[in-house]
């Protein structure tokens, strides 16, 4: 037998098992009648491999007494089995009753815990393989429902028993084979062996189909249609066949459901574990039987999900599950096959005895408890019996009886099942077994399975059911749902309408089945009757009559519901609803009253039981609370008293401090006034000199001609020789040389002790201890000694100047002449090198004393220290020093430095200044002193004539080239009032104001005071400093070393200035990387290795450990505002340097507030003013803030006018700062400096600018940003508006307009219609219908054969006017007169006349056209033109000019008329450029195809050539519209004004500097200047530092360059652009101080023309607000600061973004919310940088990097002190009381204070005795014991 036939036979037998019929009547033996009802074996389409599940519900039964009992199957049991909830391992539909019962017993409703390993021994396959093979079975959900319905519809009387042995054998084989296929191993662990089932030798079919396939081919069972059945077959056979098909279909659907669920569980497991389905393989998933998956599958088993009783996985896992319990459950749920028989040939039969448990429900013979147990009995017993081979002892005795009784009780003798208890009792005829069975209907029945190998029943022995199984059964019983009751519950009818309707068919299902009329029944008569009825109804419907004649109308009326009278029940319900709310309220009220009563009773008894104890506790709590409150109030009063006393003490201390501060301020003012007075007296001693100055003293530059340069070079050479001689002398040691040339310091009080070095003091000051008093160093006392001839009165020099005298060049000389002069001087110096070497060699053999005398450095022999009192004989100017020498035999050599202000200081101490009482007088004195010092005429510089003469006698080679006379050297007869001479080492001539500054610096050095030179930019602070250092070398013998710290960008400028004006100094430029700096430090500590060291702020911080160890004479800080922050690391580092003197150079000593100025002042005087002669102390930071900073800041920020008190405070501040600060403005000191004029040019917005401006302001986002108050958003909006004002391309670039190119034109869509129209139009020849030759409309017809002469002759032959009726009018035709013959003839003749006249008229018309035909050109002209050129076509003359041979055969005059395409384009280029600018919105690229339909590119290859496309540029202009270059100017109002301004400046020969803030504006300006053809240069932040000087020199030298465009962020302080006399600010910068610096680049020394400053401001924009705020600040600066004469930068701070708003805080009509967010200056600067473009941002950063290399140090907070015993770095000056008050005054004050304290104590005691108030007592007590309370 083939596998296919085996599978088919297996399916048939399986379907037969399900649909086996029951016997007609029960019998304990064989059927008496011998009738055996055989069931038809219906074909089944199920294949063998598709049934891998065990038929665990089947039991093997052995024959008893040689008979095989017939097991009936009831319809109710079939219905129950079709709806079972736990499929279990045997997932199939069973029809046999015994099998159904076995399934009900075996398949428990509880959750089965799956085994970790399930192994099948059948043909090497396991359960997983079987499930995998069955996973591909198609779904059968629909067929399952049909099979279930069909099984329910089977009539009871159709069932029959099957008692054939072959049938029983097949059933046993099938059960055993299916059991052996899928019986799993119930071992608890993997180590145990699996349960192996031996194959049944008699069942060959399961062995053949045991091996599953991966893709089982199991076709879906089909339902045989009724038409395919045998018409002669009985109805029972048809039903049986249909039943078997339905059951097979349902079985297939159930298997599909199970397989589909299994695959879904596996997919869910994969998703749960691996999240994604990427690596999911169905074939691999089917073979997965791991422990993890088995556990996961157990939670999703269909047995638990379909079990409605709740005894699944959820119920079973609720309690604690032990191993014993699990094993017991697994044993109870496992299905084990009994051992095979010993004799293989003996077939095994199975007898299944089933008790019909469900029949008790309709019969009502069982109570509710046992019916529920029986109805939901889990299939446990059968499975347990089959596995263990024995059952419980309690079931042995009744098992056989139960099984027999179940067979007999099910059916009555007539084969019908009884529906009630009476029929059932009548059918049992006194049978004992039946009586026993009937007497015990509620007994629990179990099926008995006997061994197939024995004939007699096998007695089961073994242990009883375990306790775990009892608990499991009890748990299952508890979890099972309550089944339906055996009898329907009683109906509680409350109303008539609630009475149920009668059942149809009496509730009998059989009657319902019999009511159906099946096909092929002998009921044709009914169909005939119905047919007649249908015919009649159809006829009425077709006739339009109503279908039901009795209706009478076709309108359907709704059936009205008959109103029902209210019954008693209705009234009862209404009363219940109405009284319900009242009852609820009454119940709540009763509950509330009950609670109240209960509480009252409880409170009563509580009071009765514990009243006394409770009252005691309450009283105790009250007293404790009262005590706490009293204590709190008393402490509050004492705290108040302490606070009052503390406030009194603080007020007294504050008053005392104010008093001491006032005294200190007065002392400072007194000291400053005295010092200023002395400076005024010293600097005005030469007022008696003759004021007649030579014109050379007022020259505008300190460069001189060749003679002056050679003279200073000679002086420098002398000095160099002197230094060389001193170095080469072996007899003089360095110490002796130092004693001879270096001054000896002296203390300020005149003592003879040496002064210690100031390094320790400055280090201590840097550490924050400013109270340490260190002896100050005095200035050097030695100076070059004048000769005796210098004491005589100088004689007046001859007014005539020799040829060798110094001539001052005018400022208008060109730079080229100066460069040539410098080159000539350098050549002369090179020629003199040989002679200088010879002079040095001769001087080398001269003793040092003679050399000193020769060069004016003689030593005095006077050693008297009293010479300091006779100052009128020893000093000649304000820095004259006493000459002292060492005494004989003394070890200490002291040089006394006397200051002329000591005597005046003593006088001032005797006459104290009452600052408070007479402030006006003091201020007047100060103002007079300053005005006298600043406004006095420029005095002449004196040069000793005798000294020069003797020097010339010593070195005659230089006397001829040195001028001994100056025009300004006229002195008075007072020899002691001579001014300081200019150092002879200094090359060049100082200006008068520079000479004053030089003398002021010298006086500072002489007085031992540090100072600030704060001249305005461009006044020569550098040359004044160089002059001071030269003076120290020449007159004091102090050669350094000096340290100059400058910004990196001006280090080169310092080196150049030193080499230019002081070449005799050795300059060390300290820069480079670490290695280069290390090489430059070689010989660092060698004496005279260098005189001046120039470095930057960055390097001085990097190498501070090196600079700190070296002693410096002068520490010069250029751009000293770099140390304005005393908390910065730079300030603290430089403060600790070892330097004798300090000089600060800055153009802006006060940038932000007065604390910046205080930082500079404290840096100058770390010890305060005590080191000055006369004592005194400079204020500390807090006092300075209280005195000056806070009041002035408040007055300035408030914007109000200053009151008298504030004005007096400002005057005091001027008086304090004036002795240490010198500041001159260019407008004050440089009288010949050209004027500066400022202009504001308002510009209108262009149309595009106005559109963009209004569009941006109208945006919702802009309004939201302005109203938000976020300063970042507001600044961004302001920056966008400024871009629109500067140029619209900055905001939005004008686009390049192009046409939209369409690959397919619109005409292409109508191609088909066009062809259709053309075809229809061309069907007829239009020229055949219309003769154009008649009307001369064919204009080209006569061009070839008609000439002009012929046309003239034709016009002559025109005879139209001679034709008849030509001039007569044609009458109107009349109607025919048919009334009479005459009338008819008349009308007829008239018609003929009309026709004749019309004919002649038409002939004349045609003749007129034919005779007037004339050609346009004529054949003659065409022939002539053709003959003039080539015969093919006329060509331009350019193509034939090269052909000389054809000169005679062509007419050049004619050919010149013909122009080529290129020539014509050139001639029309102006029109093309002007008008070819409009581009179409869209173009189509396929238009040539439609415009020239018959012309192809291959037909005319010459048209494809590039030369042919001469109109391509024109086409490009029409396709792509580039913005016109002129739009760059006309789109911007500022550029329109700039065009007008540039034209006017160009005509006047002016040159302009154009400044802007934005880098992109520079690009636009470049395009603008290139468009107009102006020459220009550009300098921005990206320009390298070394290129800036070259650009500057090129602009100043080349007058052809009209403009220089620069960025305000370009940096480079000190750039000289005096070649331009016009400055234009294209846009306003955020920082107004930057604009001042930009102006100074043109308006500075060297400028010969007036400078005009222009500002472009766009009207009605935010630029007007910016200009208004800037003007206000400049006005306030002019009123408040310039009057102080010490600073112009107080209010030159950055413009705030709020300044650009209107006075009402609006921009246009949009109100801007200004939120107070505490935004700092750095935040605002960062916001500005963010709002700007990237290029401008980078330029600003580079500029700031150049100006402030370590800008981060300015904001750096002071580092916290980490070391103990280290004071803060914040400097505090001495108080006024330190060392200022004498001892006797202190003792007197102490005695007075003690006396006052005693008096106060006595008064307090008296007040305590007489005090009537507790408050006074408390205050007095606190004051008496204040140390305790404090």
Curated annotation (Swiss-Prot):
Key words of the record: Activator, ATP-binding, Chromatin regulator, Coiled coil, DNA-binding, Helicase, Hydrolase, Nucleotide-binding, Nucleus, Transcription, Transcription regulation
Ranges that cross the membrane: none
Gene Ontology MF terms: ATP binding; ATP hydrolysis activity; DNA binding; helicase activity; histone binding
DEAH box (motif): residue ranges: 1118-1121
Helicase C-terminal domain residues: 1537-1692
EC number(s) stated in the UniProt entry for this protein: 3.6.4.12
Binding residues for ATP: 1015-1022
UniProt feature, compositional bias: Basic residues: 783-794
GO cellular component: Swr1 complex
Pfam families: Helicase_C, HSA, SNF2-rel_dom
Enzyme class: hydrolase
Bias kind Low complexity: ranges: 177-186
Function statement: Catalytic component of the SWR1 complex which mediates the ATP-dependent exchange of histone H2A for the H2A variant HZT1 leading to transcriptional regulation of selected genes by chromatin remodeling.
Protein name as annotated: Helicase SWR1
Origin organism lineage: Eukaryota, Fungi, Dikarya, Basidiomycota, Ustilaginomycotina
